[in-house]
Every structure is written in C-alpha cells, then in structure tokens.
C-alpha cells in the first residue's frame, strides 16, 4: 500500500514524515513533555496595573500606583528567573465591565501574570473573578470591601492594604469611645459603601452607639447638600461619610460650606480619608478629623526615605494604597524567585508562607483567606499651626495591632478557611 501511494504521489514519503512528526508532537503535548519550550517562549513576567487613572479615586491610586509598581520592579533588578519584568497599565474608569474585559484581554493576549491595585471594590471583585478563571494572580490594594477576603475570596487573590472592617474598627471605634453615640450615615451606593456602613454599624453595637438614619448617594456625586441637611436635621451627633476619594472631598467641602459643625453639637466622621484628600481640601477644612491608615510617609525613617524617592518622581507624597502597591509587587517578585516559577499556585504559596517586612509592614503575613494582616494606625489631621512642612498633615494617635485591626478568621465567610468544628 505504501509503495502504491508512493507511485500515485511522489511526495507521499515526505508527507508520511510530516504526519509522523505531528503525531509525536501531539502526543508530547498531551503528556506534558513540552512545557519547558512553552515556558521559554514567554520570556517576561508581566504585571498589569489596572486602576482608576482619571476618576474620583485616581488621586490615591492612578499614576502614583503605576510609579510605585515600577519602583518595586527597579529595586528588584528588572529581571526575575532570567526573565525581564514588564509593567503595563490601563484605566478601567471604575466600571466593572471594562475591568473584566481588560483583565481577560491582558491574561489571554498580553500574557500578564499578575494584576495590581484593581481600584475600587466593584472593579476589584470583577478582576478577581477573571484571575480565578485564568489561574492568574490579582492583588487588591485600592479596594476596601471586606467581601474581597470574605465570600469573594479566591486561591488567586490577595487583599493587601486595608478593608472596611479595619477602617471602621479604627475610626468608628475611636469616635464612639469619645462620646459620639448617635450616627447618621451618608453612604456611597455600591458594595464598598454598603460594606463600610455595615462594619461601622457593627462597631457601634459593641460600644453602645446607635444609627439614627442613613442616606445613599450615587458614586461621583456632585451635590451633597440634600444629604447633609437631612443628616443635620436628624440630630445625630456624628455624621459619618461612608464613601471615599472625590466623594469624600465633595462631601467635606459641602459640610464646610453649610457650617454643619459650627454649633458644636454635630461632628463629621470621614471613615475613609486619604492623604491626598487632606491635600486637596486643606487643613482649615479637615483639621481634627480622625482617620485610620495603613501607612503614613512621615512615621519612621524608612517610610520617609522611601516616600522621598516617590516624591521625587510624583511631586506628591504617597497614599497607603500606593505604598501597598510597591510592597505587594516586591513581595510578589521575591516569591517568584523563591518558588523558581511564575506559575500562580507555587507563587501564591510562597507569598502566604513568607513574612512581609519592609517600609509598609512589620511582620505582615497573608492568611488563607488572602487577607494581608499588619498593624494599622489611628491618626488625626493636624491644625494649620501644627503643620510645619509641606505634606505634614497627620499626627499618629495609636497603633492598632494586626490581630485587632482585621476581622478574625473565626468570623470569616471565606470558603478557603478551615474553621475548627
């Protein structure tokens, strides 16, 4: 038969060789004999910074987050396991569908290995789901909803900087203990705002406080007058802002305009307040506000040294999210080196097994729910007279130890957590 085929088609012998070669190659792929060739073809470790680059959360994330990630890559040496390290970035415009589409495109076509920052909670949850599907890593530094390390946890995701439990546990707890018992919430109407209001309400239940009312506003609201006047008429001693970024800035501007606190009977509580918010508003407007933060540039010699380097590039001091972008990226690269691969599973195992000690955290560690636990700090915004230099905005009031700052594993709803029966 072979001889007959050769007579009919003079190239038949050559065709049989091609067929045999393809058969061997297919078998090799089926039994995993070629992964080294596939791995060698991907000659880079790629990090994508997907965040808000132009909207209400861009000051605390944005281009500063991209800069922080690039600083970590440079400090690591620009290569890992002989591969160059590349950083790409994009603006998801705080929209979940755009975040999903971009992350899928990055994982499938750009060969991105890890996505950093993720932006607010709605986009973070969307990216985390795609990372799980593609078996890639997602590190949230810009989002706060505790859902990320609760029911939304995955084997591939890390919640690195703060969450609504830690923020409420610090600020709401401190204000309530100072006598602020009756609260009215002005809340961003999406998963982050809802989570922050709930966690703060849970704190009040343990301190003898109570909620007398709440209003919800759309993200990127321009007019807070109606919400503030309603809160004022409620008689609540504390008007709590369960929002962030530009929404917090606009709400505080309006509260100052309407002189909400002039009577001395009501106070404003900004449950999430960033260094950049204070810079935008000025100390006259923000002085005296309590806040909970994961990082402050002027806390130690190490934070000052790193922050100066950041300032030299960005002409502004870093937020805790941006400092977390640097720390988490460096920890990720060190874990690739230690694991000997950039595959998600082994790298995540190393990240969880290795303590984090740098300018951001001391003895930080990543739990099985993906929550990185570390000390948090209760701070207060300085008065104009107390501030001596540019960006000298916070005075540290107390350290909140990691074990107290974050939700205990015993209360976790993460399916990855093994609880004692």
Language-model features, listed with the residues they occupy:
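Bacterial N-terminal signal peptides
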Residues: 23-33
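Extracytosolic ligand-binding ectodomains
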Residues: 3-5, 16-18, 36, 40-421
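RTX-like calcium-binding, glycine/aspartate-rich low-complexity repeat tracts
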Residues: 8
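Twin-arginine (Tat) signal peptide motif
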Residues: 11-22
